[in-house]
A protein has these predicted regions:
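M16 family metallopeptidases and their MPP-like homologs
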Residues: 1-62, 93-118, 140-146, 195-206, ...
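Zinc-dependent metallopeptidase catalytic helix centered on the HExxH motif
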Residues: 212-213, 664
Length: 696
C-alpha cells in the first residue's frame, strides 16, 4: 500500500502547489519558524516584524482553521529519522524510563512524545485530521505574544482573524488512575553506547499545587551550579565526575530529579549513595538557611534576564497557560517564595523526598537489546513546483504595510571606548533595561598558544585563597547573586563576571583575589587530571562529540589538534605551579575589557582601577586566527560510530580572503540555499525526498 501511496503522491505533486508556509513567513520577514511538542503541549513559534502583525494573524488563522496536509509521506520519513536518532540518545532513554517508573498510570509514563515504532509504521491521515478537529480549537489554545505593539490593537487583530473559530464543547478531559505511592525504590536499567550514569527521581504534585514554590527552592538548595549541596559536597569535593539535581514541573505531576556520572573505578551504586546522602540532608535540615534567601535573589535575577527578550517573555505565558495557572499567581510568585522558611523546606522534603519513595535508572554501557531501527520505505522524489504559487501567497507578497526604518549600530554613538590604563581598552555599553552587569576580560591568546590554558582555568575553580576556601568563594558569589566563568578558545581567552550591579565590586574583589592568590592543592590537581582523562574517554562514546572532533580535524588538520590538545603524558606532567603561573601571567598582558551594565563610565573606570589587579607595564599580545586547511583534492574523512543514522558534512576552502564588497551576495546565496525551511537544500533533502531530519 505504501508503494501505491508513493506513486500517487508523485503524480499529484506534478500539479499541486507545494507547502507555502515557509514562503509566507519569508514574505513578511519572519524569523525562527519552529514548532515543538512535549508531553503537555504543542507550540508554534515565530519572530515577526511589528509592522506585519495583520499579515501574520491572517496567515496563522488560516493555517489553524483550514489546514491542508501536504507532503505527508515525506514528512513521515522525517519522523522515522527523528525516531532513529532518539535510539542513540541515551539521555532520552533515561528520561523515558524515569517517566515510565514514576507515572505507570499516566500518559507521562505510558507513552512517549515520539511514539513507538509500531505507531509510526501505521500512520493515518484521517486520524491526523480528527486530532486537529478535536484539539485545535479556541477553548484549548492560546496566542502568547510579546513585543513592540499596542495591546488593544493586538487583541483586536487576533479577534478579527481568530474570532470565528468554533470551540469544541466536547473537548476530551484526560482521565487517568491516580498514581499509588512509591514505598520501595523502582529500579530500571537502560543500555547504550554512551557513558554510564545514574538518575534518581521522586514524584511530586502538579504545577498548580501550592508546594511548587517550595520545590523550586529545594531544587536550588540542592544544586544551583555554584553553592548548592551537590555543588559543594560532590562536585567541588571531586567525589563524582559530575552531578546535578532540580525540580521538573508539569501540569498533572512533577518530579524531583538528581543524577550523576561516575569517576574512573567508581560504581553507579556508589554515585547513587552519594546522591541519596545529599537528599537526606534536605530532610534533616542539614543546610545553611542563607541558601533560601540567596536562591530567591538569584531567581529574581534570572527573571530579569528572561524579561530582556521577547521569546523568553512569551514562553512564560505559554507555561502559565499550559499549567492552567492564574497569571496573577505567576506575578506574585516571588512574594510567596520570600515567605518560605527552612522548616517549610524540611517539612516538604520529608513529605515528598522519602528515603525509599524514588525511582532509579541505571544507564549502563552496552548494546541496547531493544533497539530496532525503523526501515525507511523507498520514496520517489516529489515535484516541488517552486515557481507555482497560490493567490493567497501573492496577496500577502503584494500587501502594503507601514515600513520599518532599520536601525544600524553606530559603534561611535551606541557604545563608547576608553582606556582604563595603558594596554587595557574598555568597550562600554550602558544597560538601560535592568540592574544586571556583565564584565569580561578578553585576552588574545588561547589553546593554540598554550594547550594547558583550559586546564588551568578549570583547576582554579576548585581552589581557595588565604582568606577564603573554595566553598566560601562559591557560597559568597551565590549569596550576592553573581557568578564567574573562565574559558580558553583556540586564539582567545576570557574571564567573565556577571550578576547584580550593586555587587559588582564585591564580585570583582573575590575573583581577582582568587586569580592573584589561589592556594595550590596537589590532591585536587591529581583528581582533576583523572577526571579529565575519564571525560575524554566518555566523549569518544558520544556520536555528536565524535563528529565535532572530526569537523575540527577536517577544517584545521592534525597539527592544529596537536597544538591545541594536551596529550595524556603532557597532562599528567603539569604541576600546580605551572598552571597557576599561566593564569597569573595573563594579568601581565594587554587585553580588552567589555562592560554591559547600568553603571556610568566613570564608575566602571573607578571599579577597574580599584579591583582589576594587573601589571604596571602590560606586554602586547598579537591577535591570531586559526588557519583553515585549503581543499586541494576530493577526500572522505570518516569516524566510525555504531549508530542508526549519520552526521554528514561537506566542506571546501579555496583560500579566498574576506571581501566586504561580496558579503551581501554571500549572505543572499546562503539564505537562498540553506537559510531556512523554504531553501533549496532543505526542500530537496527533506520535503521532496525525505532523506534527512535537517539539512542546510
Amino acid at each position: 500500500i505504501y508503494r501505491r501511496i508513493d506513486s500517487i503522491s508523485y503524480e499529484a505533486s506534478k500539479i499541486a502547489i507545494p507547502n507555502e508556509y515557509d514562503k509566507l513567513m519569508s514574505a513578511i520577514g519572519a524569523n525562527g519558524t519552529n514548532a515543538f511538542t512535549s508531553q503537555d503541549m504543542t507550540v508554534y513559534v515565530e519572530d515577526i516584524p511589528s509592522n506585519q502583525i495583520d499579515n501574520w494573524a491572517k496567515i496563522q488563522a488560516d493555517r489553524f482553521k483550514n489546514p491542508v496536509i501536504r507532503g505527508f509521506h515525506t514528512e513521515l520519513e522525517t519522523i522515522y529519522e527523528e525516531k532513529n536518532m532518539s535510539l542513540t540518545q541515551d539521555s532520552r532513554k533515561v528520561w523515558e524510563a524515569m517517566d515510565a517508573a514514576l507515572f505507570p498510570n499516566h500518559p507521562y509514563g505510558t507513552q512517549t512524545v515520539l511514539g513507538t515504532q509500531e505507531h509510526l509504521k501505521n500512520p493515518s491521515i484521517t486520524n491526523v485530521r480528527n486530532y486537529h478537529k478535536t484539539y485545535y480549537v479556541p477553548n484549548n489554545m492560546a496566542v502568547c505574544v510579546s513585543g513592540d505593539f499596542e495591546p488593544d490593537e493586538m487583541v483586536a487583530t487576533i479577534e478579527k482573524y481568530f474570532g470565528d473559530m468554533q470551540p469544541n464543547p466536547n473537548l476530551p478531559e484526560l482521565q487517568f488512575e491516580p498514581e499509588k505511592p512509591i514505598t520501595t525504590p523502582v529500579v530500571k536499567e537502560v543500555y547504550g553506547l554512551e557513558a554510564a550514569n545514574v538518575m534518581l527521581g521522586w514524584r511530586l504534585p502538579g504545577a498548580n499545587d501550592k508546594s511548587t514554590d517550595i520545590s523550586d527552592i529545594v531544587g536550588s538548595i540542592l544544586y544551583n551550579g555554584q553553592a548548592g549541596l551537590i555543588d559543594l559536597d560532590l562536585n567541588q569535593q571531586q567525589k563524582v565526575l559530575s552531578a546535578y539535581g532540580y525540580a521538573s514541573t508539569q501540569p498533572d505531576y512533577s518530579s524531583f530529579l538528581v543524577a550523576g556520572r561516575p569517576k574512573t573505578g567508581q560504581s553507579l551504586d556508589e554515585v547513587r549513595d552519594l546522591l541519596l546522602e545529599e537528599v537526606a540532608k534536605l530532610r534533616e535540615g542539614d543546610f545553611d538557611e542563607k541558601l533560601i534567601e540567596a536562591t530567591i535573589n538569584n531567581y529574581k535575577m534570572q527573571l530579569m534576564r528572561s524579561f530582556e527578550e521577547n521569546d523568553s517573555r512569551a514562553i512564560l505565558y505559554v507555561y502559565s497557560f499550559i499549567s492552567g495557572a492564574d497569571w496573577a499567581d505567576e506575578v506574585a510568585r516571588i512574594d510567596r517564595m520570600s515567605k518560605i522558611t527552612k522548616q517549610d523546606v524540611v517539612d516538604w522534603a520529608n513529605k515528598y523526598l522519602g528515603p525509599e519513595s524514588y525511582a532509579i535508572i541505571y544507564k549502563r554501557e552496552g548494546k541496547d537489546p531493544d533497539e530496532q531501527k525503523i526501515a525507511a520505505p523507498k520514496i520517489t522524489p516529489i515535484v516541488t513546483n517552486r515557481d507555482s504559487q497560490s493567490e493567497f501567497l501573492s496577496e500577502i507578497q503584494t500587501s502594503q504595510v507601514q515600513p520599518i526604518e532599520p536601525v544600524f549600530v553606530d559603534y561611535k554613538k551606541d557604545m563608547s571606548q576608553f582606556e582604563a590604563q595603558p594596554g587595557i581598552d574598555v568597550l562600554y555599553k550602558k544597560n538601560e533595561t535592568n540592574d544586571i552587569f556583565t564584565l569580561i576580560y578578553v585576552f588574545n591568546t588561547g589553546t593554540e598558544n598554550d594547550p594547558a590554558l583550559n586546564l588551568a582555568f578549570n583547576y582554579l575553580s576548585y581552589l581557595g585563597t588565604d582568606k577564603m576556601t573554595a566553598e566560601e568563594i562559591a557560597s559568597e558569589m551565590y549569596d550576592i547573586a553573581c557568578s564567574f566563568y573562565m574559558n580558553a578558545g583556540a586564539n582567545q581567552s576570557s574571564i567573565q563576571i556577571t550578576g547584580l550591579s550593586e555587587n559588582m565590586g564585591k564580585a570583582m574583589e573575590i575573583v581577582e583575589g582568587l586569580i592573584a592568590g589561589a592556594k595550590p592543592d596537589e590532591a585536587i590537581l591529581e583528581n582533576l587530571k583523572g577526571d579529565m582523562l575519564k571525560s575524554r574517554a566518555d566523549a569518544k562514546l558520544n556520536q555528536s562529540r565524535c563528529f565535532g572532533a572530526l569537523q575540527r580535524y577536517l577544517f584545521y588538520g592534525g597539527d592544529f589538534i596537536r597544538r591545541t590538545t594536551l596529550t595524556d603524558p603532557a597532562l599528567q606532567a603539569l604541576t600546580s605551579e605551572q598552571l597557576l603561573a599561566k593564569i597569573g601571567g595573563l594579568m601581565g598582558k594587554q587585553h580588552e575589557v567589555l562592560y554591559y551594565g547600568p553603571q556610568k563610565e566613570a564608575e566602571v573606570k573607578s571599579a577597574l582601577a580599584k579591583h582589576h589587579k594587573v601589571a604596571a607595564d602590560l606586554q602586547p599580545l598579537e591577535k591570531k586566527f586559526s588557519t583553515l586547511l585549503p581543499t586541494d583534492a576530493n577526500k572522505v574523512v570518516l569516524a566510525q560510530y555504531d549508530a542508526k543514522q549519520l552526521y554528514y558534512l561537506q566542506f571546501s576552502n579555496r583560500g579566498e580572503k574576506f571581501d566586504v564588497a561580496a558579503d551581501p551576495e554571500i549572505t543572499l546565496y546562503n539564505e537562498y540555499f540553506g537559510g531556512g525551511m523554504n531553501t533549496i537544500v532543505f526542500q530537496e533533502m527533506r520535503e521532496a525526498r525525505g532523506l534527512a531530519y535537517t539539512a542546510w
